Amino acid sequence: MNVKVESEKVGLKLNIQKMNIMASGPITSWEIDGETGETVSDFIFGGSKITEDGDCSHEIKRRFLLGGKVMTNLDSIFKSRDITLPSKVRLVKAMVFPVVMYRCESWTVKKAERRTIDAFGLWCWRRLLRVPWTARRSNQSTLKQISPGISLEGMMLKLKLQYFGHLMRRVDSLEKTLMLGGIEGRAGGEGDERG
């Protein structure tokens, strides 16, 4: 398939200077009409960072940075004595956690990242209470004062389960077939023999 020809059929004109590709194979360079395009190892698509190797740890770190930025922007509200603690907790749940959890349904969370998720949630609550990092205060006492109900990791798990339920309720979909292991074929490439 020629990308340029197919694009022109629907009235699109390609601008090579604005175009990048991320290849899953051995493509190192590409060109259209003699102009060479750039091959990248990662890019932002739909608000998420897509990497060549499919690892989501970069996206998780990126989401924590974005969530931390939102948390910092809310500092003036957290300092206000006119706003009650339950209202501040609801603000964090409504404005910070959704930024962090965006598209978390597709993440493969490892043990180290799970600890980081817990640490970020506790960092948010300690920042909300204005507890300095040097203070010798237990995480349990912080959680007891906030009483968040469900942890950040628990919220992420809930979203994953909701998405899984959505996929399982669909009648005929590729996603459901993949989840149920219904794709026939061999594992591995040419010459891969299993005894």
PLM feature spans:
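Short linear motifs embedded in intrinsically disordered, charge-biased segments
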Residues: M1-G195
